[in-house]
Every structure is written in structure tokens, then in C-alpha cells.
């Protein structure tokens, strides 16, 4: 198939055509077990019947009406998010980048309205990832993503992740917000320590700064709780969500307390497609399935099984030195001898019929459906073991 798309993506050699649950079939009819979940998006697997029904019902009612009006699906999903989190208000958009852009803009506007123009600095983490807009790619602490787009937005300070002393040194009266991923996703599935996030909360309180948690990847059940902050004994001021929020239908959301959200008066921010009725109808139905004790317990149980199985593969193949993460968001850290070869290993896995991800050059990422069953897990692990064994046997590394 000829490619008419811009070359900013390196496409895999297969073309997915249809999918159901945790199984995908390409244009040649070959089957794959999906351990990637569309990069932590397909939280209920592919084409979940309840989501198909929700989308089908809404598409016969209302597609788009603009944010001159509100709609029942948008209000219903917002109510569910508010009722099950710290937040009082929700801003809907289309992606994680847009959710983080809104969060950062809100933080700066809130600080300006309340404290004047001198309180605008944003503190973020090295190796973080918050999106691809010019603002969010600048806040993300990875120069490889931002260096080609200078001059970049200013007033951003980066500190090492999980380095409490560096965070304490950086946050001050000039700080309007600290933004942190509870688990750094793109940089290796690296969880924040409880002490680090609790220190961030304390510093923000001390200096009248806002704590923004980027839960684009960790939210909506991936860690075994609805939101990852629930593991840490803290509450943010602003939270970003996307990916699994729509389970494959594009939607993002920024959640905030009423006091902070009040800084966004009419005209201060917006989104043409934010709160789209179809997206919110799908998101609302997905929320009902994800936010249940049965689903969240299943995530914790299956996550433990998958982590144990991956550790077993580590012992058998010698490719990994560590498995880390929470729930069904896991990363396998490559052994020193195989560092930098994560992409080669994911390609080898694909040839054996299993879809996995990279998280940087040294980590294999797993973000399967939250409904992953034992049969699909076992078959995926069987295929993965064949791929890893073959890779280790034919690799140039000792």
C-alpha cells in the first residue's frame, strides 16, 4: 500500500484491519495478541459491544453542535468524573496534549489573576512527556522532541524525576505549578515514589503553587485504581486525562477544583470539538465499565499474573533486568547487554504475532486491555517467549 501520510511516523510492516477484544487481524488475515492497547488507549479491548452500542445510539441523535451549547452526554460524563475524583469541574478536549495544554494555561492564568504576573514558572521533570503542542513539548523534559522547534516557551524549569532535593530547590514563590506523571510512561514506565509526590504536594501548598498530575496514561484504571493518585495519599489541584477515557474514540479532559477552574471565564480557552456528543457517550459508557470493583480488581489480579510471567521470561531469556509498573501498565527494563534494542525486540515480537511497545530505547512496555483474560494472556506470553528466545539466540550480544 502506498503511503500518502507525512513521514513523522515509522509504521510497522503489517496493516491492522479488524480487531476484537485483545486480538487483531491484519490485511493478510494474520492474528496478533495485543499487549499494547493502542498505547494504553483500548482499555476495554477492541470493539467492545457496549461501546459500539453507545456510539451507534448517539450517532443517530447528535454528532456535533459546538460549545455555544452543552449536551447531555458531556454533562453526564463530567458528572461521573467529578463524583469519582477530587474535581468539581471538567474541561473536555480531544487528546492528552490538549488536556495538558489546558492545565498549564489554567495554572498560569489562575496565578496571574490571584498573585500578579511574577508567578508564572512551571516546574516539570526531566524525561517527562506531556504532549506534542509547542507548550507541552517544551514542558516535557525531553530535548529530542523539542529541540527542532526553538524558540520555545520560557518560564519552565526541569528537575530530575524522584529527586526530592532538586524539587525542593526548584519550587519557590515564583512557581505557579508543578506537573508530574505518577508513572513516567514514554521514559520507561518509572513510578514516582510516594515520598516524591507527597513532597510535591507539600511544596505546592507552601508556595501557593498548583499540583498538576498528568494521568493521560495512568488514569482510567490502568494501575488498578481509577486514577493513580489514589495510590499515593495525595490530591492534585488539576488532573489531565485522555487515552483510555474514550477507549479508542478521541477525547481528553482536564479536571480541576471549582476555585481554580473559575479562572477559565468565557473566551479564555476553548475547543471546537471538545465535549463532542459521540466521544462523551462512548466515554460515559466506558467509565461505567471501568469504574467498578470487578474491573479494577481484575486489573490488579491480571497485572500481578502478567508481572510474574514477565519475570519468569526474564529468568529464561536473560533479556530483562527488572519489571516495574502498576496494574496492567508494566515495563521490562532490558539487561545492560541489550540496552538500546527495545525497538528490535518489539519488531521480533510482532513477527511472532504479539504486539508490544517500547518506552524509550531500553524498556519494553505492556499496556493491554483491562479486561485481558487468562487465555489471551497465556497465548500472548507463549508467542512472546518464542520471540524473545529466538532474539536472544540470534543476537550479537553475549
From Swiss-Prot:
The main place the protein resides is cytoplasm
Q: What is the top-level taxon of the source organism?
A: Bacteria
Quick one: which residues bind pyridoxal 5'-phosphate?
A: 129, 214-217, 272
Which cofactors are reported in the record for this sequence? pyridoxal 5'-phosphate
What the entry lists under InterPro entries is as follows:
Ac/SucOrn_transaminase_bac (IPR017652), AcOrn/SuccOrn_fam (IPR004636), Aminotrans_3 (IPR005814), Aminotrans_3_PPA_site (IPR049704), Class-III_PLP-dep_AT (IPR050103), PyrdxlP-dep_Trfase (IPR015424), PyrdxlP-dep_Trfase_major (IPR015421), PyrdxlP-dep_Trfase_small (IPR015422)
Q: How is the cofactor bound?
A: Binds 1 pyridoxal phosphate per subunit.
Q: Which reaction does it catalyse?
A: N(2)-acetyl-L-ornithine + 2-oxoglutarate = N-acetyl-L-glutamate 5-semialdehyde + L-glutamate
Q: Which EC numbers characterise this protein's activity in its record?
A: 2.6.1.11
* Keywords recorded for this protein, A-Z: Amino-acid biosynthesis, Aminotransferase, Arginine biosynthesis, Cytoplasm, Pyridoxal phosphate, Transferase
Binding of N(2)-acetyl-L-ornithine, residues: 132, 271
What is the name listed in the Swiss-Prot or TrEMBL entry for this protein?
A: Acetylornithine aminotransferase
